[in-house]
Amino acid sequence: MSEVRIIATGIAKENEIAYVRAAAESIVKSSHQEEGCLQYELHQLHDNSNTFVFFEVWQSQKAVDKHNNTPHFNEFISQVKDRVELLDVKLMSKIA
């Protein structure tokens, strides 16, 4: 199986930036500890502080599916779903 790379972008509502950032930071450590997680990083745009980007690399789609069903992932989604304007997830494969 090939690695799965994910770029997940969340745009926090103006008055929810600190809350969304704290929730996003809290999921990183738990995700790093999951089997199949090769990389899990959280970034914040310089020119738009309400935009957060996760960059993830997983060993396989099976590992991604398992991650998406963990308690910490589901709690994160429930915490931020009403506090973001956008949550966009792109799955990719490295080609070069």
Predicted region positions:
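Glycine-rich beta-strand-turn "strand-cap" elements at beta-sheet edges
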Residues: 2, 42-48, 77-96
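Localized chelating/binding microdomains
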Residues: 25, 54, 85
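Short, well-ordered beta-strand segments in beta-rich or mixed alpha/beta enzyme
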Residues: 4-10, 41-68, 90
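Short beta->alpha connector loops
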Residues: 70-71, 96
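N-terminal hydrophobic or amphipathic segments with adjacent small-residue motifs
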Residues: 2-4, 9, 25, 30
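Beta-strand elements of well-folded, non-transmembrane domains
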Residues: 12-14
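Short amphipathic alpha-helical segments
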Residues: 16-38, 72-76, 80
